[in-house]
Amino acid sequence: LKKRLAHTHCRHAVVGISGGLDSTLALLVTVRAFDMLDMDRKQIMAVTMPCFGTTDRTYHNACELVHRLGATLEEVDIKEAVTLHFSDIGQDPSKHDVTYENGQARERTQVLMDIANRLGGMVIGTGDMSELALGWATYNGDHMSMYGVNASVPKTLVRHLVRYCADTADSQTLKETLLDILDTPVSPELIPPEDGEISQKTEDLVGPYELHDFFLYHILRFGRHPAKVYRLALQAFEGVYDAATILRWLKTFYRRFFAQQFKRSCLPDGPKVGSVAVSPRGDLRMPSDACAALWMQELDEIVE
């Protein structure tokens, strides 16, 4: 990021802040890059965009994080804009389907891009490698940025990095904020909360990230076959997940990994910071219409 900022002569960065892990790490990385360039942290525009699914907890943590890091906070409530958009396209706002969710994500990206244009800055992407592998991102929504700093960082590593930042924080308030973010359920917060609490929990929907990151590592780093990945997972997660659970989420991984390649085929630039990546310009050159049938067939032949 430091190199990209210097190369483009950008004096401003724009980061969407949700109060979740990924946007937290993206902001921490951006702050570090600005410090290395001797640039004022106030030139980092951290934008919180509350909407239908935003909870008080994540909103408070987002604002507190920006304040403690010394960046500039801008709040853009997108409820009215999204409601008008739904009216324009004939979307029933009481129908919480994929259009309801993606409309919010794309509105947020539009806001960030336009603020970046206003400032002559760069939108910093927040999505991590685990989300990209699963396609757990809105096409041309949070999927898009001008530079994705987390693009090769798996979700499990995001958590460790944020915890490291909490452990080495220079203020108790910043540490407490980071620890509360770590303790918050992973969620895109696109569905209204229940009794003020997050109702949409990512790992309930797509499976545990520690499993998916394990699958991703062995598939991309070593090219292991599905049955081999399954056997390794049985050993690695013995006593944590039973065989049926591992097989269920491994099938989910392969199904989504193949079906969602079209999102990875047009990823923005980002650094490779580990041993595997899903960039079409790097480790993963895969056609968007590749079929998962052979891999799924091998999994279907497994007898638990």
Give a label for each model feature:
Residues 1-19, 23-304:
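ATP/NTP-dependent adenylation/nucleotidyl-transfer catalytic domains that generate, transfer
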